Each structure stands twice: as C-alpha cells, then as structure tokens.
Design a protein with these regions (language model features):
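Glycine-rich phosphate-binding loop of nucleotide-binding enzymes
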Residues: 148-250, 500, 521, 547, ...
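Conserved nucleotide-binding/hydrolysis micro-motifs of P-loop NTPases
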Residues: 62-64, 101-104, 172, 219-223, ...
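Phosphate-binding and hydrolysis-coupling loops of NTP-dependent motor/remodeling domains
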Residues: 2-4, 43, 95-107, 532-574
C-alpha cells in the first residue's frame, strides 16, 4: 500500500532520516509518493525529536532496486532480456542532504549536533527560508539592494519559485562571471546590467539612482542598450565608444539618450614614467627584461620638462608640457628629438644602441597609436576620455552606461595591443580620479566590466597572449579599487588564463559550465566548493550557474538558473 505524504501544519512530510547523520550532512529515505517529487537543490526541514528544526538542501538522489544490483540472482535473466517482477523487488530511494543550520527565532544558527535517525523530513516553507533571504518572501517586496537575476535551481516553476538574488552592498568587493562559450556567461552579465538599469534607487547609496557602469564589450554583446536605452532607463545616457575608421563610426544613434564618441586618449593623465613604460612595453611585446636601460632613459627624457619646452615650444599649455603634442610631433619634428638624444650621446648619458632602440620604440608607438588607429589627438584637450568624462559618467544625479565597443564593428581591424593600451589607460585614469575623489571626501562609484578578461590580465604561465600593458594597473584596481568605489566585474571563458592575483581579488563568482582543465583552478580561487557541486561544473546546461561569495545572499554556494535577457540581438547568448 502506497504511503502518501502527510501534511503537518501546512507542511508536506517527505520521509525519514536514516542512521549516521552528521551535523553537516545526512541521508533520508523518502516516502513512496515523495520519490518522484523531490529534486536536487530542494530545501527541506528536519523536525528532530530533540526539539530542533534543521534547514537542509537535497544534494543527491539515488534509487535502488535489489534485482538490479551487480551480480544479483536476476543477472543471467537480464542478459537474456527478461526483466524481474517489479512488485516483489525491494525498492527504495535515498536522498543526501546538506544541513545548513538550525532554525531559531533569531535566524539560522550553526548546527552543533546532528539530528536523530527517524526524524521526519518536510518540504521547507517560505517562512522557513526567511532567515536565508532576510525578508518576507510571501510579500515579494525585497530590499532595494537586492537584484533578482533568476531562480533557485529546483524552484523555477511559477507555482514553486524562489528568486536568485545578488546583494549589491558587496559589489565593491569585485566579482567574476566565468564559463565556456555557449554556457550563458555574457547573458548573465547582461542580466545584471539590465537589472541595474531598472533600479529606482539604492538604499545604502542614497545619492545614486543606480550604479554607473563601463563595459569593455569584446563581441557586441551589450550594444542592445545603445540601440534601445529604454531597456536601461535608470541610466541617463548610453555612450558607445568606438575607434576612428571603424564600421560603427558612421552608424549614428537612433535614440536621444544614446551617444556615439570616438576613442581619444589623454596622455597627460599619466606620469612620464608611465608613458615611457607603455611605449617600451608595446615595442618589446611586454618583455621588459633586458630593456631596463631603454625604459630608464626614455623616462628621464620625458621627465626633463625644460628641454622638452625648448625643443617643442608649441607643446606647452599653461606652463605644462602636453605629452599628446610631444608624441604627435615625433614624426614631423624627428630632427628635434634626434638633437636631444645626440646631446645625451655626446654627454655619455646614453649608449648609442639604447638611444637607437628608444627612437624605434617611439616611432613604433607613433605609427600604431597615432598614424594607424588615431587614438591620441594632437592636444590633450581634444581627448574624449579624460577627467571631465569620468566626472560626467559617475555623476550620482545622472549615472551613465558606457560601452567600450571592441567588437569587429566598433574596433574594425584594431590590434589587441591597442585595445590593451586603451583599457590600461582608462583604468589608470579611473584609479587616479577615484583616489582623488576619496581624498576630497567625495563618494563616487563605478562598475567596470571586462569581457575576455584573460586578454587584459593574462596568466603568462599558461596563456599564449603573453602580455598586456593593462595587466599592472588592472592588478592595482583589483587590490585597491574597492577602497575607492571602483568595482570590477570580470567575464572570461578560461579563468585559469587570468592572472591568479587578479582572480584571487574577486570575492563573488558566478560559475557556468567550465572546461575540465579549469575545475581545480575554479575550486581553488573560490576558496573551495562542495564536492557535489564540483562534480557538475563541466556538464551544466546553458544558463545554469553556481553562485558563491559575498554578493550571494546565501552563506554557501548555490545552483541558480539565470533568466534570459530582455533583448540580445547582436550575438549569441554566451
């Protein structure tokens, strides 16, 4: 006779606890009718005879039939295609549960002792889950610092759904979205941006309507918001930055809240040493070992303001050297530069071989950044990405969404080293500006999202790209940016290809399906994942992810099903 689930105070009885339970893990045997209704990821309660109520999550389900065990009496019959009689077989199901804690009036307490064999197991109610969500689920009114990105795995149906939430109060601690191509990682980041774009205010950031954001868009995954800013109405404007000469340059916006701007860099935001390091690094493909003399000499040359004023008198603005002008004059006034270097040669300040290498590095920089891609205007005042631009996009009263369009349409024919240079310069400018905000006591916030993060902070031990001029400043932002309100959101398909120091600074991870070679790295960088989660990392369906870290409202890793974005017409949901 079938055992039907009992209802106790509105709860459905699912089964009974088996022996050898621990304070962190246990097994229960479901009732016959409950065998088909339970799912992995399902929340349950254990009402112990000790007077305690445990909250737990089903992590694994196993079905048993004595006639289908290896070497059983029916083994020979099975070989002949004869099935044993189901009605006389000993059949049962066992469900493994992870014990999350003990439900108390004050919330969820740590379980300091295990439940007892025979304790009944019930389906968890919304009231049981309130300590985890920290608000009344029955009202649907969540705090404004939570954004809903999907559903808890196992609770996706309309009649039985639980929201998957992200806590924005910890966004300044950085986060990463990882997964192989086609796993849904760009859809997930897009969903987060969409949710930020519909906020009407954030309680803990009273002056902000939403969090300003800048996205390094590698494949055009976020251009929907430029085409239709109504998808992200909380942003006063959606700005698309593209390279001069790209296909996007001639595609004017159709919406009044969209703006198209060509990428123009202001070198004056950086020190002579930083400029010199960039020029030499690009020339040597990032391998500065052995180029120390060149770097030191170029740094000294660019720092000698008096000599530069004398030779490049048109490059002086308000008594200051305009390095945009100096670099632009390299080709036209090469003789002046050669005269400076010749003076140093005669004074034995530089070896001829070093001087020649520095000249070649300067010419290479000019040809790549100015002649070919036109991203350094003749004067710094004509730069589009400058301190005023940062002030504008992070204005709390009118936060903006900025898309650095590095797709084939926005960066047609642009070398990776040039994209790295742009990202490095933007990050350096942001770091400098946000440090100044903090010194002045001014609170500013910006989410900086980088798609294909492995190209900008590569792990040089394993990733063939070899180097990135953006890596050093990206590491600085990862380690210190949180203090100033500069938040990172990294997106990558190969997390082990990203610099380990940068990845270790991420305090929240949204993990989609990963490559087998990345499983160990992911488990390490996240601080360890439960074995039952780790086993599934390589074969999760698209849209399914593991959420873990400080932006997770749950104090442990959980499976979540991310909702699809409202619109995504430029590329696949990857």
């Amino acid at each position: 006779m079938a055992s039907e689930p009992k209802l106790t105070s509105g709860r459905k009885e699912l089964g009974y606890l088996l022996s050898r339970a621990r304070s962190s893990f246990a097994y229960f045997q479901p009732l016959k009718d409950a065998e088909v209704s339970i799912k992995e990821g399902m929340f349950v309660t254990i009402n112990s005879k000790q007077g305690l109520t445990y909250l737990a999550e089903i992590t694994e389900i196993s079905h048993y039939n004595e006639y289908y065990e290896r070497g059983e009496i029916w083994a020979e019959a099975l070989r002949e295609g004869l099935l044993p009689p189901e009605e006389v077989a000993r059949r049962f199901t066992v469900a493994a549960v992870r014990i999350l804690g003990i439900l108390t009036q004050g919330g969820l307490a740590n379980a300091d002792k295990p439940p007892l064999p025979g304790d009944p197991v019930y389906d968890a109610t919304l009231d049981d889950l309130r300590p985890l969500y920290r608000y009344d689920l029955s009202t649907g009114q969540k705090p404004d610092y939570y954004i809903e990105v999907g559903r808890m795995y196992g609770y996706e149906s309309e009649d039985r759904k639980l929201p998957a939430l992200i806590d924005l109060r910890n966004i300044n601690m950085h986060f990463a979205v990882i997964g192989t191509t086609g796993s849904g990682k760009s859809n997930t980041m897009g969903k987060i941006i969409e949710k930020l774009g519909t906020l009407g205010g954030i309680g803990f950031l009273k002056e902000y309507k939403t969090i300003p954001a800048m996205i390094v868009d590698a494949n055009g995954d976020y251009l929907d918001y430029y085409e239709n800013p109504d998808l992200v109405k909380s942003y006063s404007e959606v700005i698309r930055l593209c390279f001069e000469g790209s296909e996007a340059e001639n595609k004017k916006p159709y919406h009044q809240n969209s703006k198209l701007i060509k990428i123009k860099i202001d070198l004056n935001a950086f020190s002579p040493t930083e400029i010199a390091e960039t020029i030499i690094a690009i020339y040597h493909s990032g391998k500065l070992e052995g180029a120390e003399l060149q770097l030191n000499y170029l740094s000294t040359l660019l720092s000698d303001v008096d000599r530069l004023r004398e030779k490049f008198h048109l490059c002086t603005r308000n008594g200051e050297i305009d390095y945009n002008c100096v670099v632009n004059e390299i080709k036209e006034n090469l003789k002046k530069l050669e005269e400076l270097i010749e003076e140093d040669r005669k004074a034995n300040k530089v070896h001829s071989a070093t001087a020649d290498a520095v000249l070649r590095a300067l010419m290479n920089f000019y040809d790549l950044m100015i002649k070919k891609h036109k991203i350094i205007p003749r004067y710094g005042a004509k730069a589009t990405i400058n301190e005023d631009f940062i002030d504008e996009i992070t204005n709390p009263k009118s936060p903006k969404l900025v898309i650095l369009d590095f797709s084939t349409e926005g960066a047609t024919g642009v070398d990776l080293s040039v994209k790295q240079f742009v990202v490095g310069n933007v990050l350096a400018l942001l770091f400098k500006k946000f440090t100044a905000y903090r010194v002045k006591g001014e609170n500013r916030l910006l989410l900086f999202v980088i798609e294909e993060a492995q190209n900008y902070a590569p792990n040089i031990q394993v990733y063939p790209v070899g180097f990135s001029v953006a890596k050093k400043i990206l590491a600085s932002v990862a380690t210190q940016g949180r203090k100033f309100g500069l938040c990172l959101g990294l997106v990558t398909q190969r997390p082990s290809y990203v610099d380990p120091i940068v990845m270790s600074m991420m305090n929240t991870f949204i993990i989609h399906r990963v490559a087998p070679g990345d499983v160990r790295f992911v488990s390490t960088v996240t601080g360890g994942l439960p074995r039952y989660i780790e086993r599934r990392l390589t074969y999760m369906e698209p849209g399914l992810a593991v959420l873990t870290g400080q932006m997770n409202v749950f104090p442990y890793p959980v499976f979540v099903k991310i909702d699809r974005r409202v619109s995504h017409k430029y590329s696949s949901l990857t």
